[in-house]
A protein has these predicted regions:
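Catalytic machinery of carbohydrate-active enzymes
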Residues: 1-251
Length: 251
């Protein structure tokens, strides 16, 4: 395959999956000598997507827009990005994301299901494919396209570098509460069903508080996190930072 100048990475999963794509993106950027790399992600993961280095454009898919008008969103993506990329890489095996990979890239790579009843047509039309392995860490799954492209890599995660401004902001906040060493406790998730129950969370926080180590509770300003913020118990070693820090400041 000729060296691609424009690449799009498709990740229709959660924040963690987007975050753990940075090693793949870093390897592609270095091996192909600074190509344009764009992302297509779910709109609720765009905050983490913006922190990944070497990304030029970020396009989003919205499940809300899908409910409002089933086909308009797909039509808009198709019209604006059809065969715009030399290479598309899709990190999930869903029908929609594979369709995007086929439509957006002249050459396409995608994860597919082990079940041939679901993946047979994908294997016919994709340039390359690999089987998504649920028993492997998501980072290792995300690096599989590099094997197909014969790009050497290490099984390590390339951390996201926070800006100097974000670093100074969080140092200022820690100085204000006279905290140097601490434990980060992040009680939230993107979806309610993934959140640790309130009663068990409070028991865990009470146990952590008894250790005498400062505990920073982190979270965003969204509806789920704002509800949790009100439920966090007050204790001498607990600092409720929910809604007071940016995602970048976590790094």
């Amino acid at each position: 395959m000729r060296k691609p100048k424009k690449i799009i990475i498709i990740i229709q999963r959660s924040n963690g999956d987007v975050f753990l794509s940075s090693s793949l993106i870093n390897a592609l950027y270095e091996h192909y000598e600074s190509p344009q790399i764009d992302l297509l992600v779910n709109d609720d993961t765009i905050s983490i997507a913006k922190l990944i280095p070497f990304i030029k454009n970020i396009y989003t898919f919205s499940y809300q827009k899908k409910q409002e008008n089933r086909w308009k969103q797909e039509k808009d993506i198709l019209l604006s990005l059809y065969k715009k990329y030399d290479l598309s890489i899709n990190l999930t095996a869903s029908d929609r994301s594979v369709f995007y990979a086929l439509i957006l890239g002249k050459k396409s790579i995608s994860a597919v299901e082990n079940d041939n009843r679901k993946s047979w047509w994908k294997k016919i039309f994709l340039t390359h494919y690999y089987y998504f392995n649920n028993s492997k860490h998501i980072l290792l799954n995300n690096l599989e396209p590099l094997n197909l492209l014969k790009i050497n890599f290490e099984n390590i995660h390339h951390s996201i570098q926070a800006s100097r401004e974000a670093t100074l902001n969080i140092k200022k906040k820690l100085k204000a509460i006279k905290v140097n060493d601490f434990v980060i406790f992040h009680p939230s998730a993107q979806y309610n069903f993934k959140i640790y129950p309130k009663n068990l969370r409070n028991k865990l926080l009470a146990s952590l508080d008894s250790l005498g180590i400062p505990i920073l509770i982190t979270g965003s300003k969204n509806e789920i996190d704002s509800k949790i913020k009100k439920e966090i118990p007050k204790a001498s070693n607990i600092y409720n930072f929910i809604g007071n820090t940016s995602l970048e400041e976590y790094f």
